[in-house]
Amino acid sequence: MKNHPARPRPATAVLTRTLRRRRWLQWAGACAAAAQTAGFGSGVRAQPAATSEPPRLALLIGNRDYPEGEDLPPIHKNVRDLRAALERRGFEVDQGLDLDQAAARAATAAFAAKVRAARPDATVFFYFSGHGAQVDAENLLVSARINPKARPETLVRTSMTLTRDVINELPRRPAGLTIAVIDACRTSLRDVAGGEGLNQVEAPSGCLIAFATGAGRPAIAPADESRNTFYTGSLVKLLEDASDEISFSDLFRLVKLDVQNVMLNHPVLLLRQFAQFPFIAENTQISRRLAPLPEADAATAAPAPARFASRDEAADWAALEAAVWPAEIARLATDFLKNHPKSRLSGSAEVARAGALEAADILRRRDVRLFRTAFQPAEGLPANELVKAGRGDKDAAARVARNYGRNASRFDASRYEGWLQYAAALGNGIASYELALHYRRVEQPLLAAQFESRARELGYTPPPSLDNTRK
C-alpha cells in the first residue's frame, strides 16, 4: 500500500507528533510484552482475575408455525441443534417454540430477570429464528401464526420489536457480554428481489448483534425440516469445531466468512445472485473465549492445553494484536498463519487478515480521506477502538469518528469526515447517513445526497422523525 502524505502542518506540531509516537510505542510495547508471556507453556489462559467462568445464559426462540406458504420447516431443528452446541459451551439454555407476542414477551422478560440476578460479567445469548419485518425503520420479530405479509399496522401490533422488547429489555452489561442473534428467514425465492429485510442498528455498550443477512436483504431457509438454515447451520458447526481460544467476537466473524463462502459457491444460481452476507453490529468492551474457565474447585482437573506452542508463536501473536494499521495487520496475520498453521488462534488470525485486507483496500480509495496518522493513538481516544477499526470494524470506525465530531472536545472536521467515510465504505449505513446530515449542515448538498444515497444502498432506513428533520 502506498503511504499517503499527511497534510502540511505547522512546525509547532512536530513535538506533538513525537510525543504521540512515543505514547504509541509505549502502549504497543506494553501490549506485546503482556501477550508474549501470557499462556506460553502453561494451561492457564491470560484472563482477568477470576476464580471461575461467569455464568452463561441463553434464550432461544424459534417460530416455525406461520400461515400456509409462509411456514419455516428448519426452525425447530435450528433451536435443537443450537441448544446442544451452546450447552456444550457451558450455557444454561431456555427455549420457546412457536410463540405469540405475549408468550415471547413473557419469555424475554423472565430471561431478563434471570440476567439481572446474575453476575454483572455474565455472558448472555438471545436467539430468534423465524420471520422478520421492518416497519417505519423498526425491526420486528414476527410472532407465530401471523402472516409476515400482513399490513404494517398488524405486524406492529402483533410482533416483538428487536430494540424495545429485546435489546432494551436486557440489562446493560459493560463488564459482561450480551449477544443477540437474529436469523430471520423466508423459504420462497420469488421474494428475494423485493428489497425487503431488516434495518441496520447500532449495538449498545457491551453488546454484539448478529444478523443472518445484511440490512435490506432476505435470508433464504431450505423448505426441509431435516436441514438448518444457512446461517444457523454455520453457527452450530463453528460452535462445535472452532478452537476454544477464539473469542465470541471472532466466532461470529468466522460464521460470516463461512456463510459468504457457502452462498457464493452455491449450485443454485439465484441463491448466488442474491447471496445473504451476514451483518454484525458490535460494541463489546471485553473479549471472552469460547471455552469457559474451569471451576474454582477443579484443582484435580487436567490442565487446559497451552495457548501457544512456542515462544515464537507467542511473540508473533503479540505483534499482531498490537498492530493497528490495516496493511501491517494483514501482513502480520498472513505471516502468523504461514508460520503457525496449527495454532489455536489461527481462526482469529484469519478474521484479522480478512478484515484488514478489506480495510486496506478501502483506504486506497480516493473518496476515503483517512491516512495513517489517523490511526496513531491520541489523548482520550480509546486504543481498543483503533485496534478494532484497523481490522475493518465499521462500528468502531464510527465511534472513533464521533470522538472528533461537533459535540466532542477535540472537534476536527477533517478527521470526523474521514473516519465516517471509512465507516461507510466498510458498510456502516448509519455512519453514511450521519455524514450526509453533516454535509447538509455545512452546505455541501452534492456530498450530502451522495452519502444519503449510499446509506440507503447499504440498507439503512432512518427513523421517520430523523428523516423528517433532514427535509
Model regions: which residues?
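Hydrophobic face of amphipathic alpha-helices that form TPR/SEL1-like repeat modules
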Residues: 335, 399-407, 434-441, 467-470
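Short helix-capping/linker turns of helical repeat alpha-solenoids
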Residues: 391-394, 407, 426-429, 458-461
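Structural signature of tandem alpha-helical TPR/SEL1-like repeats
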Residues: 326, 374-382, 409-419, 443-451
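Short coil/turn linking the two alpha-helices of tandem helical-hairpin repeats
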Residues: 320-324, 361, 405-410, 441-444
